[in-house]
Amino acid sequence: MTDKLIIRGGKKLAGTLQVDGAKNSAVALIPAAILAESEVVLEGLPDISDVHTLYNILEELGGTVRYDNKTAVIDPTDMISMPLPSGNVKKLRASYYLMGAMLGRFKKAVIGLPGGCYLGPRPIDQHIKGFEALGAKVTNEQGAIYLRADELKGARIYLDVVSVGATINIMLAAVRAKGKTVIENAAKEPEIIDVATLLTNMGAIIKGAGTDTIRITGVEHLHGCHHTIIPDRIEAGTFMVLAAASGKGVRIENVIPTHLEGIIAKLTEMGVPMDIEEDAIFVGEVEKIKKVDIKTYAYPGFPTDLQQPLTALLTRAEGSSVITDTIYPSRFKHIAEIERMGGKFKLEGRSAVINGPVQLQGSKVTATDLRAGAALVIAALLADGETEIHGVEHIERGYSKIIEKLSAIGANITRSSAAETKL
């Protein structure tokens, strides 16, 4: 049986929320440790299921992982390249970073096809194109990807689609290849800079991370290092939206405001008062939310990952707001759930029209993916009465200790296993 969250809405929240390390960095930094030949220490990792799944996978490969609080000590010295069945790999989409890392270190890898949130077609063809350009032979046999290379040689690779996953994966494979690699039309996300920083600390030579052209000069060996992960800009943005929806003064700590320009701009346009500090953001209470139109784009544009949480807040806005997702046009599964709570929406192609303001009512809803889960939590906090959210495991894939964090600022939120309620 899956567990559920029970939230009694209508309370005004106040206090401080701490942002954890970036999920989208963590799932790449941990596989990147495979490339080193001595101990790698990663600090500030989020305590989420994806991270623990990756520790298990590294141990399956013969590595050792010591984990304490938010720090992991990874010793990749005795790792060997062995086929990774789809058990753990199926649990997370970002297991594809194991391909680049294992190819970079061992020149071969066998990996079951990755899992994670299902957001429509997100194929890994750009990753494979990059690996092939570096000299790997890639085949798909019985639902597993086989990668083999006699040697990896630097190449010029143009990505047809700006892809964070492909950019990082090619970086991982190229840092120990012979000669120079150039990735053109590379993604520019902060998480890419974070991975490049780790690799550089390990002895890699990388220029241009964070721009659309990344240049890598291959080296033979990489060594261990200490690295502190960047804060999670999507968790920070989710907390900002939540504070605007239900807060009466919420301070969000451990943030990098320059990573949050898209959401800061839109909340400002909606009339949300904010104080931006060096590494914290204070969100004040807001009486009336103004309607806005939003289009998601690749970084530094408005992130697709915050589109769903924002939908919940916009049920409070006066008039019709339009959200257009240019990245994942089918990312609107949460809307049917918020409609059960009384939300008024119209779907038009890759856009959703949100008509407000409406007072949401508690209901039974289901989180279909990670950010839909965040949207439903915000909707439940806004609603009159009690909301039951099923599919908690989706939420916990990306938000660590969400119940403790929200309870600490006054939310009435508990978890119950669905089995208990049947007795």
From Swiss-Prot:
One Pfam family linked to the record: EPSP_synthase
Record field: catalytic activity: phosphoenolpyruvate + UDP-N-acetyl-alpha-D-glucosamine = UDP-N-acetyl-3-O-(1-carboxyvinyl)-alpha-D-glucosamine + phosphate
Main location: cytoplasm
Entry annotated with the keyword Iron: no
Active site: 117
Positions with a binding annotation for phosphoenolpyruvate: 23-24
Binding-site list for UDP-N-acetyl-alpha-D-glucosamine: 93, 122-126, 305, 327
2-(S-cysteinyl)pyruvic acid O-phosphothioketal modified-residue sites: 117
Subcellular location: Cytoplasm
InterPro entries: Enolpyruvate_Tfrase_dom (IPR001986), Enolpyruvate_Tfrase_sf (IPR036968), MurA_subfamily (IPR050068), RNA3'P_cycl/enolpyr_Trfase_a/b (IPR013792), UDP_GlcNAc_COvinyl_MurA (IPR005750)
Leader peptide range in chain numbering: none
Alphabetically ordered keywords of this record: Cell cycle, Cell division, Cell shape, Cell wall biogenesis/degradation, Cytoplasm, Peptidoglycan synthesis, Pyruvate, Transferase
Recorded GO CC terms: cytoplasm
Gene3D superfamilies: Enolpyruvate transferase domain
CDD domains associated with the record: UdpNAET
E.C. no: 2.5.1.7
Role according to the record: Cell wall formation. Adds enolpyruvyl to UDP-N-acetylglucosamine.
Family classification: Belongs to the EPSP synthase family. MurA subfamily.
Record's protein name: UDP-N-acetylglucosamine 1-carboxyvinyltransferase 2
Organism: Listeria monocytogenes serotype 4b (strain F2365)
Classification of source organism: Bacteria, Bacillati, Bacillota, Bacilli, Bacillales
GN (gene name): murA2
